[in-house]
Each structure stands twice: as structure tokens, then as C-alpha cells.
A protein has these predicted regions:
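Extreme N-terminal starter segment of soluble prokaryotic enzymes
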Residues: 1-4
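Conserved Rossmann-like nucleotide-cofactor binding loop
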Residues: 11
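Amide-donor transfer/coupling interface in amidating biosynthetic enzymes
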Residues: 68, 101-157
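Cysteine-nucleophile active-site neighborhood
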Residues: 48-117
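Short acidic low-complexity segments
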Residues: 27-38
Length: 157
């Protein structure tokens, strides 16, 4: 299996690579359009600011490459958010792969501090990605923004 991790100065690229190595998978980390297009699967990681990151993707000409991919793409953190239509972070137009808005948590409505940092339970699992993960499993989050729940959602927390 040929897995490409999109290289664009995302903060969690090495963590994703390390996780795949633990599974016996040797991914390629690349910003080369051809390598990304030829991969069986693509991982789009990310930690950062939506506006600055979108600008960087445009400069690298990866915005069009990502939008045109036909193989499975796993967006992680900001990578997932950038596949949506628009982010409130920097009032940023994103890749518009999914017609979803990325919104900032409203602090008045929450009993938590923002950014939300900590362990949450996964619920409503709707993807084969979670076949070996139990409902109510704990996962760690660090975020101030979220993708609206929609028909494209594969889990909630």
C-alpha cells in the first residue's frame, strides 16, 4: 500500500508518520503533486492557522492537487478543516471539498476553556476507520474550531 502524507509544514506530520511506522507502514512525506496523485491513499495532516496554511497550499499549488484527488484522503486536524468550504479562523475560503463551515467554539455556550484541550469520548462512529475502536473510546483533542456536524461526519465527540 502506497500512502502519501502531504508535506506543507504542518505541525503534526512526524506524529502521523510515526503512527504509521508503528503499524508497519512506510509512507512517503511529499509535496510533489505526482507522488500525491499516484498514492493509493493520502493523509492530509495539519496544525496551524487556516488562513496562513491555505495561502501556503496555494503557493505550493497543492490546493488544486488536493481538490482533484480521487483516492481516499484522511484529513487530520487542520487538514480536515481545510477540506471544508470556509473557516471562521481568518475568515478563510478553504478547499470546498465538503460544503461545511468550520466554526469557532462559542465560549459563552461551553463549560470548557478554549482552546479545548483534553480527552473526549468518540461517539456515533460511522466509518470503517473505526472498526477496531470501541464506541466511547477516549481520544485527545487540542482545538478551538470544529467542523459542523453533517452527512459527511464520521464521528462526534
Amino acid at each position: 500500500m502506497n500512502i502519501a502524507i502531504i508535506k506543507y509544514n504542518a505541525g503534526n506530520t512526524k506524529s502521523v508518520e510515526h503512527a504509521l511506522h508503528r503499524l508497519g507502514i512506510q509512507p512517503v512525506i511529499t509535496d510533489d503533486a505526482e507522488q500525491i496523485q499516484q498514492a493509493d491513499k493520502v493523509i492530509f495532516p495539519g496544525v496551524g492557522h487556516a488562513e496562513a496554511t491555505m495561502q501556503h497550499l496555494i503557493e505550493l499549488k497543492l490546493d488544486k492537487v488536493i481538490k482533484e484527488l480521487k483516492q481516499p484522503v484522511l484529513g487530520i486536524c487542520l487538514g480536515q478543516q481545510l477540506m471544508c468550504s470556509h473557516s471562521e479562523e481568518g475568515n478563510t475560503d478553504c478547499l470546498d471539498i465538503f460544503p461545511i463551515m468550520v466554526k469557532k467554539f462559542e465560549t459563552a455556550d461551553l463549560q470548557y476553556k478554549i482552546p479545548q484541550i483534553g480527552w473526549n469520548n468518540l461517539t456515533d462512529l460511522k466509518s470503517p476507520l473505526f472498526n477496531k475502536i470501541n464506541e466511547q473510546s477516549f481520544v485527545y483533542f487540542v482545538h478551538s474550531y470544529y467542523c459542523e456536524n453533517s452527512e459527511y461526519s464520521i464521528a462526534t465527540c
